[in-house]
Amino acid sequence: MRVASVLASVAVLQLFSALAFAATDASAPDVAALLKRLDEQEQRIKSLEERLALQQRKPAATGGASVSTETSNPASPASVNPTPGTAAIAVAPAKAGPQGFAIQSPDGANVLRFRANLAFDGHWFSDQSTPATADTWLFRKVRPYIEGTLDNTYDFRLMPDFAGGKAIIVDAYVAARIAPQFVVQVGKFKGPVGLERLQPDQYNRFVELGLPSSLVPNRDEGAQLGGDLFGGIVGYAVGYFNGVTDGASTDAAGTPDQDNDGKKDWEGRLFLQPFITTDRAYLRGLGFGAGGTYVDITGSAANALLPAYRTPGQQIFFSYRSGATATYADGRRERWAPQLYYYVGPFGVLAEYVQSSQQVSRQVSASVRRSGQIDNSGWQTSFSYFLTGERELYNGLTPHSTFEPGKPGIGAWELVARYHELRIDPAAFAGGIESFSDPAVSARSARAFGVGLNWYLNQNIKWMLDFERTRFEGGAPADANRADENAFLTRFQLVF
């Protein structure tokens, strides 16, 4: 220790001083007295060393807790040469990178990350039927959030959204990773059903999700048990949730983020990646499975608990009858969603089918009440290909280069294409004026073809440009077809 070395040096100097004094002064003490004096000096040094060791074990600044001297900059002068006589103060490592800004404890067991998801969109239409007001710029997502881990076990996230001039809670949950096979999650988060819906937002290949994603739940409140078995070959999740209508989140309910019907949804998903551990690269990217939900609910004309469906350009093309004689949910709601993806090299494909069945009723008059079951379905197949050779993945991307003005590198460029459709059960339009949906307003089906170009400037910034052409069956007066929708959609997205 540096202080001990200084004390030893002082003792040596004192010894030489005493010997010099004895050699030059006739009245100097005898040898026995000199040895006694040296022994006293040695005891004094030993006492000082013990006090120094005690001070380093119990720094006053931490109330006796052990403190690490590791800092985020180990080569800094303060960490290499602390001020003598002061206790070392530990600095938790701070990091900044593609995954956001993070602060963590010296042992890495506790981490707090500051992140954000910002999406600024442009919607432009070249058809003659979409209202001119639909041509617009808008913030689709404004989501600063925090997430982290406690004790290497408990993950958490709190994510609000300020887009659209309002504030909502998008995610708010805690997940306990008891083991890879057992993860308990509680709070508000995405339900375990739709494949595209479960994909992290920053890895969606199109500006808007496909039509079948309109049939699966978005974010719900509840508790879920899930995990990975056999090294990730089998993934499962089962949960008990408040329940939401097709494509919706609990913040869109009549009373936001509260149970609006008193009934609970069972939701579950089983997903297999049978070759994830194999050496065959052309098989590792194959995954398939199915998700589903079940509940028995009863709404009312005032609280119908039924969805409306939108086009890729976010225009409503189907809704149930509303008003005093509105159609409302009245019985079982079941969803079934088989799904598949395959990624190899720069190529990827994602496909899914969804069927949503809902028993409904409508009090047409005081004496007439109609009931029935509506089975709506949708499917999609989407393709993606990296022109710059990056590896396609369901939930990740690392560009081979980044785009910085004045430097080499063009980022990652990706071509995407998809076909998707949503079909409404003909039973929704049966019965004339007593039907559950008005055929002069709502379409019987929507079929869309989309192409797009994505530019990943780096891992955090993405620019997307899509064109979606949607054709309809029905949806206009006199049983005519609603005019086609031609939508140009763009998004500037920042995620860190």
Region spans (language model):
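Bacterial N-terminal signal peptides that target proteins for export
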Residues: M1-A8
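Acidic-residue sensor for enzyme active/binding pockets
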Residues: E42, E49, E196, E208, ...
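Outer membrane beta-barrel
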Residues: A96-G299, D375-K407, A412-G431
